[in-house]
Amino acid sequence: MYPSLALTANHAQPAYSHDTPNFLHSTGSPPVYVPTSRMPAMLQSLPYLQSCDTAHQGHHLANHPGWAQTAESHAFNASSPHTPTGFSYSHSPPVGNSSARDGGYQSPLIMGGGARDQYGNTLVRTGSYPSPYSYVGADMPPSWAAGHFEGSMLHSLQGRQSLSGRRSSLEFLEEFPGEGRECVNCGAMSTPLWRRDGTGHYLCNACGLYHKMNGMNRPLIKPQKRLSSSRRAGLCCTNCHTSTTTLWRRNSEGEPVCNACGLYMKLHGVPRPLAMKKESIQTRKRKPKNIGKGKTSTGSSTSANNSPSSVTNSDPTPVLKTEPNITSQYSGQAIVPVSQGHSQTDDLVNGSHELKFMPDEYTYSPTALSQQSGLSVPLRQESWCALALA
């Protein structure tokens, strides 16, 4: 990018510096693009190009086929502070050793500071264009004095930095929306949901809902808890003048009455007599619901575990009536005679003996049961068939 590199290309032929608006080339190297404004500063930094005569420069510039010299142009001089408006064409001595080549490579570093100063001073004097080094941050001060436009650019950079700082703070608040907010009504700092009133102020969830439902601000003083119904202050039964009850009622006139007087008036239609007033509140003694179920379950279990003697004395035991001279024809059944007093009484009435058996412990054949009972229909072999025969 630096034009001085092209000056060390050829050793046999002299290298010429052709000051065109955009190109600098020698006889043995391709042209290199160089801005026109940097050419005077570069030529000023090269001492062996300043010894050329001005007449020779003007002669070659006039004979150049591609460009014509203007009337107001003048030759470039090292003492002239302004950049030339025309073009110069000068010879340069041949470069014969490696030291000149090294100097050519070092020339960009040598001309860097001077070119920057010359370029910057020119722009400061004209005041029409900003500095080309304005992209450098504010922490890197330039080597020339800041002009009008450069100062404005620095101020704009500082303004952008301040805006970026504000933007970052706003983004931080948006990232944590609950931070730094306070309810304007109760002063709460944290709430599940932030709301706004009609003026845009922040309200906590409770105050916002209260304002939305009631149309007014939520009261800061919490209301006192209501007393229990049995100890409400200032309440007294208009009938019996008691102040203790489980439930306060109202009569037809809207006056408060105790639970007892209110129920009595509701059921009988007359006021409750004062003679029925008691000092203590009578409560109903309700039986627990599980007691009845427990009794039925225990009764069934005891009846199932009773002995045969107790079974014979119980009333619901099935009874099978047979003739006195007939013996049992079906196997597996034990016939138990009843006591004589009981059997004699039954003989007088029925003229037969009663035999009791255990239906749960024995099985019976259907043919024997049908022959014994005198039934023509065969019985099904089930445990409850003996109950049907009773």
Curated annotation (Swiss-Prot):
Domain of life: Eukaryota
Keyword terms: Activator, DNA-binding, Metal-binding, Nucleus, Repeat, Transcription, Transcription regulation, Zinc, Zinc-finger
Location (main, coarse): nucleus
Bridged cysteine pairs (disulfide): none
Any single Gene Ontology cellular-component annotation: nucleus
Keyword tRNA-binding part of the UniProt annotation: no
MF terms (GO), sorted A to Z: DNA-binding transcription factor activity, RNA polymerase II-specific; RNA polymerase II cis-regulatory region sequence-specific DNA binding; transcription cis-regulatory region binding; zinc ion binding
Biased composition (Basic residues): 283-292
InterPro entries: GATA_N (IPR008013), TF_GATA_4/5/6 (IPR016375), Transcription_factor_GATA (IPR039355), Znf_GATA (IPR000679), Znf_NHR/GATA (IPR013088)
Pfam families on file: GATA (PF00320), GATA-N (PF05349)
GATA-type Zn finger ranges: 183-207, 237-261
Compositionally biased residues, Low complexity: 293-314
Tissue expr: Highly expressed in heart and throughout the gut, with lower levels detected in lung, gonads, liver, and gall bladder.
PANTHER family per UniProt: TRANSCRIPTION FACTOR GATA FAMILY MEMBER, TRANSCRIPTION FACTOR GATA-5
Name of protein: GATA-binding factor 5-A
The gene coding this protein: gata5-a
